[in-house]
Amino acid sequence: MTSQAFPKKALAGVRILELGPYVALPMTGRILAAMGAEVIKVETNKVLDEMNFIPAWSRGGGQPEFQRAKKRITIDVRTPDGLEVFKELVKVSDVFMTNFRRNILDRWGIDFPELRRLRPDIILMWQTGLGGIGPYYTYKSYGILVQHMGGVSLMSGEEGEPPATINTSYSDYHTGVFQPVAIMGVLMRRRLTGQPASMESSIFKSGAVTAGPALLDYQSTGRMPERIGNRDPNAAPHGVYRCKGDDRWCAVAVQTGDQWAGFRQAIGDPDWCSEDAFASLESRLANQDRLDELVGAWTAGQTAEDVMTRLQESGVPASLVSQGKDLYEGPHLKAREFYRTTPFYLADRSKPAWEWEGMEGISSANPPKLSESPMDYGHYSNIGEDNDYVFKEILGMSDVEVQRLHENQSLF
């Protein structure tokens, strides 16, 4: 079979039903949609995802980032008519994924046994904060809480200070990357065996895997992790150093003898570099306070870009600490085609023209670049914009029926 016989997109022909808010689940759908799957995002105007409230209305940063390339529809599954429409969609979908609690799904009448009855070979994915079993499974969880429970924050922060929060939902993003891999795996299994599958995923576990070294250290030695700020037990100098400019910094890591020689060359090999206190990694680790002061005195007179360039040219790992401007205007991500200009299409022209016409948003690409089936980033549509396509073309509903269910707020 020639390559032309395969679909252009890696997941073309796969239909996925997504029901749930926040970051991890929409991130999963975003990745699968970019790879060609038809991801139908089920929402309702009655209870909006918090991402809609990041300014501006319905165009907040979270929306173009997580909802692009999806088919966005409105169904209130809590209504009898809405529930029936949702069940019809289940019958024509390959995957159903959600992050609602099971007791909520049970109350709505879309528990997993019922979904499997509607489509016996459907793949079911349930994502929670802490998982579906275990002593904490009923606990409420949210971003920062799961981050701390996962253990990474215990290692973050300065010596003698409280654990430091990483100010982004990194566990959600990890989960959003792990879940597409699992879904593609069970899709392949179903193709090979014809058998369906269910999976359960937790944000807690996705965060805990990044604390692996601390877990292994405790298991083998009984040691607890220590907070050491930006330092590293196997490198010196190792830290983030202030540079010329407003809140400009550069990260530097010197691990090997060759890197230390390159570092000395890059900074002009001042006399202090020849002191016995800095002759070996062990001695540099023992004298880090003074070493950091000396390195910081050198970086303070240079731009972060110059520090990075000079050290890298001498074989020393170094990087500026990027601000938003660096990420957006920097040459490397542009060369990687990381940013996408995403147009805003709006079917509902009841909004004032000045609010919508000509609007575009910038969103990030998925990190992998596929050579033969490039990612499809589509456009950013408004909530409910794809109602006609899904209800009329996929489900074959009439204009009259769609209008009736919209008026009684089942499709709202």
Report each predicted region and the residues it spans:
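Short Gly/Pro-enriched turn/cap motifs at secondary-structure boundaries
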Residues: Q63, P225-P233, V240, V252, ...
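A short glycine-threonine-serine/GTX helix/turn-capping micro-motif
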Residues: P163-H174, P196-S198, I228-G229, A236-H238, ...
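Aromatic-enriched alpha-helical interface/lid elements that frame and gate functional surfaces
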Residues: P237-S314, A318
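An anion-binding loop in the catalytic cleft
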Residues: C243-R248, A304, G361-F412
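A glycine-rich dinucleotide-binding beta-alpha-beta segment and adjacent secondary-structure elements
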Residues: S314-P374
